[in-house]
């Protein structure tokens, strides 16, 4: 989540060190004393678009895209959720326009039940363990269904896009899931599979076993470099990808 000053400073350094031109944030937060313009200035990226899905007295929460290049159009994919939504932005690079999709799909949110399970397990409360496991399974099933619906919404918009497409975000699901595969369709290349190395996990919880954050692109792009460094200030590793637009006029 992007809200604490130190994290914003760390992201600024990440942007500068990696010469990042387009930055997609899935858990954007604007505190009352630090708005989008201020954050934008700290990141050093002059263009931005933000959508909020939850507002409180002290902060607004949502999703955002920051860009070195002009953003000429943008829109929200509204999931009617206080925690999750997606968005797109048409970005002008030279004389070419690309569309970037930034996604934060339904949160699995089983950590609390997982903690309860460990508590019951530590005292050998078998009935408590069983109840908690049932709750976890039911919660997982419900969230799978929600993510499937969200993935269909995102894919429908991808299919109507006439520009070169980049899709990224926190899918809260694995490469084996319906959500991942439906969004990928038959025309998007997974950046990790194209240029990544090793196991490639992106979520640092659950013993670092899961890759749930992705970047993919259509045939208009060539993947050059993929990196997902471990950073101590987030439970997700950032996905950093260098791609080349084949049709660029620059």
How should these model regions be labeled?
Residues 3-9, 16, 22-118, 229-231:
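Structured beta-strand-rich core segments of catalytic domains in phosphoester-bond hydrolases
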Residues 148-166, 171-250:
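Metal-dependent phosphoester-hydrolase catalytic domains
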Residues 7, 11, 32-35, 147-150, ...:
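Stable alpha-helical elements in mature extracytoplasmic
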Residues 115-139:
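A solvent-exposed, charged loop/short amphipathic helix patch at secondary-structure junctions
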Residues 1-2, 22-24, 138-144, 166-168:
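Second-shell loop/turn segments in exported
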Residues 12, 90, 155-159:
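Generic structural signal for well-ordered alpha-helical scaffold segments
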Residues 134-137, 141-156:
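Active-site beta-loop-alpha substructure in enzyme catalytic cores
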Residues 2-5, 27, 141-149, 206:
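Soluble non-cytosolic domains of exported or imported proteins
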């Amino acid at each position: 989540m992007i809200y604490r000053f130190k994290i914003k400073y760390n992201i600024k350094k990440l942007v500068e060190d990696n010469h990042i031109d387009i930055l997609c944030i899935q858990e954007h937060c604007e505190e009352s004393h630090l708005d989008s313009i201020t954050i934008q200035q700290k990141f050093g990226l002059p263009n931005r678009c933000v959508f909020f899905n939850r507002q409180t007295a002290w902060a607004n929460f949502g999703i955002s895209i920051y860009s070195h290049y002009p953003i000429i159009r943008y829109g929200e994919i509204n999931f009617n959720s206080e925690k999750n939504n997606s968005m797109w932005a048409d970005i002008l690079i030279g004389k070419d326009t690309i569309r970037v999709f930034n996604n934060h799909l339904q949160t699995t949110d089983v950590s609390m039940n997982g903690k309860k399970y460990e508590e019951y397990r530590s005292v050998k409360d078998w009935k408590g363990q069983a109840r908690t496991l049932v709750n976890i399974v039911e919660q997982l099933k419900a969230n799978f269904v929600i993510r499937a619906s969200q993935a269909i919404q995102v894919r429908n918009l991808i299919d109507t896009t006439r520009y070169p497409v980049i899709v990224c975000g926190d899918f809260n699901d694995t490469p084996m899931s319906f959500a991942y595969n439906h969004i990928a369709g038959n025309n998007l290349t997974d950046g990790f599979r194209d240029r990544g190395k090793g196991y490639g996990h992106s979520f640092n919880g659950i013993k670092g076993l899961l890759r749930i954050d992705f970047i993919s692109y259509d045939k208009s792009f060539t993947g050059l470099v993929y990196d997902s460094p471990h950073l101590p200030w987030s439970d997700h590793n950032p996905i950093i990808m260098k791609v080349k637009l084949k049709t660029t006029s620059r």
